[in-house]
Structures are given as C-alpha cells and as structure tokens.
Design a protein with these regions (language model features):
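Short, glycine/acidic-enriched capping/hinge loops at junctions between secondary-structure elements
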Residues: 15-17, 25-28, 40-44, 84-86
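Phosphate/pyrophosphate-binding loops at sites that engage ATP/ADP/AMP, CoA/4′-phosphopantetheine
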Residues: 55-70, 154
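Conserved NTP-handling cores and scaffolds of large molecular machines
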Residues: 19-21, 59-62, 66, 108-112, ...
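Short, glycine- and charge-enriched coil/turn segments that flank and shape catalytic ligand pockets
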Residues: 19-22, 38-50, 123-131, 175-179
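Active-site neighborhood for divalent-cation/phosphate handling
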Residues: 71, 75-174
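Amphipathic alpha-helical transducer elements in NTP-driven molecular machines
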Residues: 10, 48-56, 97, 144
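Gly/Thr-rich phosphate-binding beta-strand-loop-beta motif of the actin/hexokinase/Hsp70
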Residues: 1-33, 70-77, 173-179
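N-terminal phosphate-binding loop and adjacent alpha-helix
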Residues: 29-62
Length: 179
C-alpha cells in the first residue's frame, strides 16, 4: 500500500494505491477541508494540533492506521520552498552533488536560513552539448523539520517528501513508464 498525502491550502487530500502486475490501482481516496480554510499551509507557522487532528480524522474516515502505512509520499509547498530549472555541465554524480550546493546559493534566495537542497536531472539539454537540465530544489531546514514532525505526530513514518512540481513530474513519469 502506498499513501499519497497532500496538505494543501484548502483541502487535505489522500490517495491509496496498491501495486498490481500492470502498475498501480487506486483503492481509496479522501478529501477533508482544512481546519481554517484559505489559510496557507505553512509548516513553520501552523497550529500543529489543528492539522494533526484533521489528518487523523481523514485517516479514520479512510480506515487507515498511520502506524501501518509502509510507503508514505508527501510534498512541501509554499513560500519557504523554491524550485528552479537550471542548465549545468554534465558531470559525474559526485561532482554534480557538490556543484548543486553552490548553484543553489547562486540561483535560489534562501534569506540566510540553513537550507535543505536536492535536485532532479531532467536530461540532456537539447540546445547545448555536454549540458544537462536540472530541477534545483531548496527549502529551509525549519520547514523540512516541521513537516517531518507533523507527520510523526500524526503517527506516520515519513517516507518520500517531494515538492509539488517535482511530485507532479514524478507521478507523470511513473504513470507513463518514463525514466
């Protein structure tokens, strides 16, 4: 069982997928209005008990015990998350990893906060030889930690944490059997 959980501005959304021979099958889904509609979900500023209760109620409606979820996929969004597509030299994985920290500081404003940085390679750049296109992602460590703490408070074991644009791309790639 894979649980996808999206804590959005107006709704908390969840889907449950089971792996089948042909891919995945949607077996359950749920939707719940957030505790204070139209309030932006900001992991750094939320009243955690409100959100914990709302997600737990949704899980109860869906008959899901958070402690039994083996594969949880969530995403971060909001003003403390930055995503930027950049073009960089094609290089070995180890060098690319080191290079991304430098590139993040150059391309993504993080107001001096300690950042959590990740990236995803889109592929070769069609216009420039020996260059690749990369999605560079950064958020504050405080945002990441607050999201993880929220998930733990609900009873989940945090799994994959994406940012919304990358989550959409990964879902599309996975559904269409793309690399």
């Amino acid at each position: 069982m894979i649980l996808g959980l999206d804590i959005g501005r107006q709704y908390i959304k969840a889907v449950v997928l089971d792996k089948t021979k042909g891919g995945h099958k949607l077996v359950n889904h749920g939707l719940r209005l957030v505790p204070e509609p139209n309030q932006t979900f900001d992991p750094e500023k939320i009243s955690q008990p409100h959100w914990v209760m709302a997600v737990r109620e949704l899980m109860k409606e869906m008959k899901i015990n958070p402690k039994r979820v083996k594969h949880l996929v969530t995403s971060l969004n909001g003003s403390h998350v930055s995503v930027k597509q950049i073009t960089t030299m094609d290089m070995p994985q180890e060098e690319l990893h080191s290079s991304m920290t430098f590139e993040a500081r150059k391309h993504i404003p993080m107001d001096g906060s300690e950042a959590v940085i990740d990236y995803q390679i889109f592929g070769s750049n069609p216009k420039e030889v020996d260059k690749i296109d990369v999605a560079l992602v950064a958020c504050t460590k405080k945002t990441s930690s607050a999201h993880i703490e929220l998930l733990k408070e609900i009873g989940f074991k945090p799994g994959i944490i994406d940012v919304d644009p990358i989550a959409i791309m990964n879902s599309y790639s996975y559904a269409n059997d793309l690399p």
